[in-house]
Curated annotation (Swiss-Prot):
Mg(2+) binds at D8, D10, D212. Keywords: Hydrolase, Magnesium, Metal-binding. HAMAP family: HMP_PP_phosphat. The keyword Nucleotidyltransferase does not apply. One of its GO terms (molecular function) is 4-amino-5-hydroxymethyl-2-methylpyrimidine diphosphatase activity. This is HMP-PP phosphatase. Catalyzes the hydrolysis of 4-amino-2-methyl-5-hydroxymethylpyrimidine pyrophosphate (HMP-PP) to 4-amino-2-methyl-5-hydroxymethylpyrimidine phosphate (HMP-P). The active site is at D8. Signal peptide: none annotated. It comes from Citrobacter koseri (strain ATCC BAA-895 / CDC 4225-83 / SGSC4696).
């Protein structure tokens, strides 16, 4: 029996309308009744996730910013990792050949250079909002991560540029097909979950995790049971062929799987 369950949010727990379904909430409550510890492992900001937890009255640990921050159920920071200031400065100030928009995150929030209303649709549940600033004036020593949002093919070309400029001094990953993230070296959801499990006195073999994107890869492959969403990025499924694929987030597939796991743990599972 798993003792810790880790959940990605977008494309996993959240439905396509960016809300948590009633079945999902009921199943999470059942896990807590079984004394299974919950953690939400997401690229979203901790300020947003605290609002969501308050809205659903749920106790959970938070892994936010794709592993840059870990917070306890009481809101205490357990772990932090920022971008190397030299890396942040380079990314902020270099002229990149891309049409993608740049988004900068630190403990104070989400910052970008101009309004992009379409991006706010993903935050309708919480009302979390970017702040419009001159991103080049953000102090480099306060940056947790930098994201570029745009066309996937354009982001692939940008990733080549970033790799050439940064080398092995940062982690680059696609948290969605339209979002490329620059993270601190060695920082990902998997490494953060290892820190959290150690804090809780658990081994990763006692954890299960759910995800759909390449920023979930390390987490999914490191736990005792990793589950991939049916709507996952094809690259994730291809790189982790030994992991089970469940249903689509629109059908609250995490709840469907966990209900079976709680009620019939010894029977084979089918997403149908």
């Amino acid at each position: 029996m798993a003792r810790l369950a880790a959940f990605d949010m977008d494309g996993t727990l959240l439905m396509p309308n960016h809300h948590l379904g009633h079945e999902t909430l009921a199943t999470l409550a059942r896990l807590r009744e079984r004394d299974i510890t919950l953690t939400f492992a997401t690229g979203r900001h901790v300020l947003e996730m605290r609002h969501i937890l308050g809205a659903i009255s749920m106790d959970a640990f938070l892994i936010t910013g794709n592993g840059t921050r870990i917070h306890s159920q009481e809101g205490d920071m357990l772990h932090r990792q920022d971008l190397d200031p030299a890396i942040a400065d380079r990314v902020l100030h270099q002229a990149w050949d891309t049409r993608a928009s740049m988004h900068v995150f630190n403990d104070n929030g989400w910052f970008t250079g101009s309004a992009i209303p379409a991006l706010l649709q993903a935050h309708v549940y919480s009302g979390f909002h970017y702040q419009i600033v001159d991103v080049k004036r953000i102090p480099a020593h306060q940056v947790t991560k930098i994201c570029f949002c745009g066309d996937h093919d354009d982001l692939i070309r940008l990733r080549i540029q970033l790799n050439e400029a940064l080398g092995e001094r940062a982690n680059l990953c696609f948290s969605a097909v339209d979002c490329l993230e620059v993270l601190p070296l060695g920082c990902n959801k998997g490494s953060a979950l290892a820190v959290l499990s150690d804090h809780l006195g658990l081994s990763l073999t006692e954890c299960m995790a759910f995800g759909d994107a390449m920023n979930d890869r390390e987490m999914l492959e490191s736990v005792g049971r990793g589950l991939i969403m049916g709507n996952a990025m094809p690259q994730l499924i291809a790189e982790l062929p030994h992991l089970s694929v469940i249903g689509h987030c629109r059908n609250q597939a995490v709840s469907h799987f966990l209900t079976h796991w709680l009620d019939n743990p010894h029977l084979p599972y089918s997403p149908e």
